[in-house]
């Protein structure tokens, strides 16, 4: 899918393309990094529960489990919270033949269980002391970057021992487009043997909330000297009446099937 605006996500880069150059009507468009915004347009128009399987495209992705193009399953369930959606994903895995045991842990639980860090009540100075003690670079401006760094070094290696682990209620600083309640965002990720497979939210609903989150992301991209482009004003206009209360998830198909086959 070609979009008029790129992703605002701080850590996901869009691929831009020039179209109609031979017609002397050249314009810049962007390959979608997920079908999220297109699907939320449909949700705002009353589509109800909705799913899509499609190819998505991301720049600056390379490695054993990363690719510039991959297949994504994305779906939204009206009136679901993240716990209902996580349960449905477990049912989906069972339908695909998985009988592996599943574990659910909150972000705070997983940090305390595997590292004895009180992640939700630790400020940026506390976390910088921990990263320094581990010999890691602590030169970060935002606390969420240090939270993610510690997660990668202290938590992800432990998750390799768990066939399927769902981690929910992330710190509010990592909310992305998830609803925030108190110190946590109603967001979850699913890991299979330590590899992230799915990312889901209890979705924010109003156009104003999306505008605020997008602007926050664009400001961070600018601070990191990344292309920060502009807001998708067409999307915000389409969401004038908001979307219904729902939860949604994106699942990487290639990663999922490669791990189901183990």
Language-model segments: residues:
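Acidic, low-complexity central loop/insert segments
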Residues: 81-107, 126
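Mid-sequence acidic-hydrophobic segments that form the walls
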Residues: 45, 56, 60, 92-99, ...
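Short, conserved secondary-structure transition motifs
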Residues: 101-119
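A translation/RNA-centric and nucleic-acid-associated enzymatic feature enriched
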Residues: 1-5, 9-45, 49-81, 119-262
């Amino acid at each position: 899918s070609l979009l008029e605006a790129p992703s605002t996500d701080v850590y996901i880069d869009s691929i831009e393309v020039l179209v109609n150059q031979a017609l002397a009507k050249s314009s810049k468009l962007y390959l979608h990094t997920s079908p999220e915004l297109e699907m939320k347009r449909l949700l705002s128009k009353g589509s109800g529960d909705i799913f899509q399987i499609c190819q998505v495209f991301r720049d600056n992705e390379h490695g054993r489990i990363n690719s510039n193009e991959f297949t994504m399953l994305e779906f939204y369930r009206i009136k679901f919270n993240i716990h209902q959606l996580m349960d449905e994903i477990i049912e989906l895995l069972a339908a695909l033949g998985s009988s592996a045991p599943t574990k659910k842990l909150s972000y705070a639980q997983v940090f305390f269980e595997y590292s004895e860090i009180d992640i939700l009540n630790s400020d940026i100075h506390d976390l910088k002391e921990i990263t320094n003690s581990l010999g890691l670079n602590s030169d970060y401006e935002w606390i969420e970057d240090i939270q993610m760094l510690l997660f990668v070094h202290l938590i992800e290696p432990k998750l390799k021992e768990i066939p399927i682990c769902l981690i929910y209620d992330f710190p509010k600083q990592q909310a992305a487009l998830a609803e925030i309640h108190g110190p946590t965002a109603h967001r979850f990720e699913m890991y299979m043997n330590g590899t992230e497979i799915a990312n889901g939210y209890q979705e924010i609903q109003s156009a104003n909330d999306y505008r605020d989150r997008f602007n926050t992301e664009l400001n961070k991209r600018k601070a990191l000297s990344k292309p920060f482009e502009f807001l998708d004003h067409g999307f915000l206009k389409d969401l004038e009446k908001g979307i219904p209360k729902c939860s949604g998830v994106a699942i990487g198909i290639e990663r999922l099937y490669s791990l189901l086959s183990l």
